[in-house]
Design a protein with these regions (language model features):
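Feature marking well-ordered beta-strand scaffolds used for ligand recognition
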Residues: 1-203
Length: 203
């Protein structure tokens, strides 16, 4: 959903006591895909957005839970233009234990401690680890051809000791202002601090 929240400035200034955001547009892809959406993260300069589902069941009982790329140039009519690719062996992760599928995305929070990502996103994927995706312009040369999603990196830790699922369960992934990635396991694995070393920029 995309809302007009311009009226919040009046609340902040004290000229209005309350404000009800106005719905501008929405995209509905649950169904046919299983609900529900967890995170919506715009890339404002490109007028694109990432949206992640939330996996909530073990062993892919609510699969697939994906990361989507949307065109939000027309705020009243957001359109899905791509999905993040899966690995060839991801089917095996459905049987490995615990959850497998999309969850959180790095938030583009204003302030000095978060890296502002306008072309990429970093996603938590439970036993699929941490996955990095980029919205890549079409090489076709066709005007206004939509970008597509490419994976530019991933990290899947070993199963932490005593994790009840028998697998890692990466729950969050956040990128700081230096480009370091902080990811946590939702049970016993603690915090992982990662440095991206790929050739494609994490920007």
């Amino acid at each position: 959903m995309i809302f007009d929240i311009a009226g919040l400035a009046q609340v902040a200034s004290g000229s209005a006591r309350s404000y009800t955001p106005r719905l501008l547009g929405r995209v509905q892809f649950h169904p046919p895909y299983p609900a529900w959406t967890h995170t919506f993260q715009p890339m404002f300069k490109r007028r694109l957005a990432w949206a992640s589902d939330e996996d909530t069941a073990d062993n892919c009982k609510d699969a697939p839970k994906l990361v989507w790329l949307l065109d939000i140039r027309a705020e009243t009519n957001p359109v899905i233009i791509g999905t993040a690719p899966l690995h060839a062996d991801d089917g095996a992760r459905c049987k490995a234990g615990g959850r497998f599928g999309a969850h959180n995305l790095h938030p583009n929070v204003p302030g000095p401690l978060y890296k502002r990502l306008e072309n990429t996103t970093v996603a938590s994927w439970f036993n699929g680890g941490v996955r990095l995706f980029r919205a890549v312009e079409s090489p076709s040369g066709v005007p206004d051809a939509p970008p597509h999603v490419e994976e530019i990196g991933y990290y899947i830790p070993e199963a932490p000791p005593k994790n009840p699922s028998g697998t890692v369960q990466i729950n969050h992934a956040i990128v700081d202002e230096r480009g370091l990635i902080y990811a946590n396991d939702r049970f016993t694995g603690g915090l992982y601090i990662l440095r991206y070393t790929g050739r494609v920029p994490l920007d």
